[in-house]
Amino acid sequence: MENNDTGVAESVFIGGMFVLYGSQYADILEHYGRLAGMSDAEIASEAASVRAEIGQVSKAVKTAGWDGEWFVRAYDAYSRKVGTHEDTEGQIYIEPQGMCVMAGIGLDDGKAQQALKSVKERLTCDWGTAILAPAYSTYRIELGEISSYPRG
């Protein structure tokens, strides 16, 4: 097996970033669009378009990106979940939990609260918060560098 750069992998973490920063972009448009020479109609149209895309990505993250108790990290180039309870290693990653919660994904249905609870239970210890758990025991070429991180 080799690392497959097909461009079809999808990151739930990046989906959360899109929702968070897309929302901020829409707010910036509404507050400062006139200073950029935009008309009120252009501002309203662009902000509505951005918010519609945000809604679609947020919905996709809540459905395809939810693993039951936390957000998955991604789907690899073979459409396999990365960061799922279905695997024996690398079940949960910190990045999508924080990013999706900061973006407000799952605040309305308890997913955000559950994701943070899972972080506390599965990633947090006396020395801080781990990047992922459980750590990978061998290098996985399809995942790359993240599979070489030591425990903790």
Provide a role label for each language-model segment.
Residues 1-152:
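Acidic, mature catalytic/reactive cores of soluble proteins
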